[in-house]
Amino acid sequence: MRKISVSLCVFLTAVLCLPLIVTAGIRADNTMTAEQQVAAISVGWNLGNTLDSYGTWIDNVTPESVETAWGNPVTTRQMIAAVRERGFNAIRIPVTWAQFTDSNGNVDGAWMARVRQVVDWSLDEGLYVILNVHHDTGEHGQDKVCWMIADMGTYNSVHDRYASLWTSIAEEFKDYDNRLMFEGYNELLDPNNTWNAPSTGDDAYNAVNSYAQLFVDTVRATGGNNATRNLIVNTYVASADQAVLNAFVLPTDTVQDHLICEVHAYTPWDFTSHLGNASYTTFDDNCRNQIDGLMSNLSSFSARLGVPVIIGEFGVENQNNDADRASYIAYYVTRAAENGIKVFIWDNGLSDYGEYGVFDRNSLTWNETIVSALIDNAPSGSAVPAAEPAEETAAETIAETSAETTAEVQQTSSVQETVTTSANPVESGVNTDDNSQSVNRNQNSFTILFIIGGVVVAASYVGLFLLGRKIGKKKRER
């Protein structure tokens, strides 16, 4: 009897510890390092010219009118599912907040709800997600909505507004697991709209470094999962120019190993854009050499900072040269992977000459020549299984209705931003390790584990109670 009782107690003690073990596993998932998260990414896709769209000419500013202003349909869960099914395991969601925030940085509730819905769909599909502040930066002028400029005077004047904006975003998503990453700003330009490297020198660099530090401090202060969320900071105009890389200062952080640096590199610009050299459409050794130099520089940059570096945007325009585009993509992705750099292809949803689109969001079909070159040469990654779609929500119904009522706008509107740099295109127009496998559980899995743990604990206590009664009865019989 004594031997049986001891064995039973040991067993029940082990069972009682199970929920603690489960909780510890969940904790580990929620605090993966930046390096672990980047390692788990295979290849990413940009939901371009959608939530980042804007228009000073839009009379009735609503989430639907802005989302479709640059010619793309309203985003649906089916689109996000198609991205996952084609082999991507990460998505970058560019968002322009300017037309939905007041001067104090307070965000309109309907816009925040729409952004959250797209983020939810992406996470439910098992994707890693990057959420950013997009055309609140970039070129500024009469027809723009940019209010963040890379100079210290502007930084000081918008300091509180920027902090308030990121406080609002961070509070909205503070309980989301760490598959969601925040990117502080897209492409900060100096007062002269100078691409690649600033014309104003140290003042612009100091401003970028200040925005980066304020972003990190603001998000961390909101607590919750934001205390250890992996945060992304970009260089001046997200440029990979060597002078820009040299001037970048990584923000200080309250936790270690939770920062990522991002650049955008359409290299070489003469080949990737008709704005560079419209006659240069053949992939050649010059392209290879420039890509080699880019990846080598970024690898050294990553080593200097001590953080992973990602390429948040890259791509090549359609210049009726799909075979050469595919060769470029395959070489670019291969060299990036060899240097430990993960990439996100820019897709503006448009496929005509001079555009970057590879995914038709109306028919849910891909330019297979380009996408096969991308997916087949990307390293393997990992993602959680997609969650079953819930019943259609009111927001989805509104979105679908909007898609029908704005069809005419979608056909006639094609707002195009033009730039003259390798840092930014015309925006309008996988090694799997044990850690990454464990990281990719969604919150539904956590809930199930806790329920199981609770049932086990309850059963254990019942067992102990019955054992106690049995022992007491034996003693009384004696």
Language model segments and positions:
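Sec-dependent signal peptide cleavage junction
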Residues: 18-30, 436-446, 466-472
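N-terminal carbohydrate-binding accessory modules
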Residues: 25-90
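An active-site-proximal structural segment forming one wall of the substrate-binding cleft
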Residues: 70-91, 101-135, 139-184, 207-223
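Catalytic domains of carbohydrate-active enzymes, especially glycoside hydrolases
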Residues: 73-96, 294-302, 335, 339-344
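Active-site region of glycoside hydrolase catalytic domains
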Residues: 156-277, 296-317, 338-341
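Substrate-binding cleft of secreted/luminal carbohydrate-active enzymes
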Residues: 285-379
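C-terminal low-complexity, Ser/Thr- and acidic/Pro-rich disordered "stalk" regions positioned immediately N-terminal
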Residues: 385-444
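C-terminal membrane-anchoring or membrane-association module
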Residues: 454-478
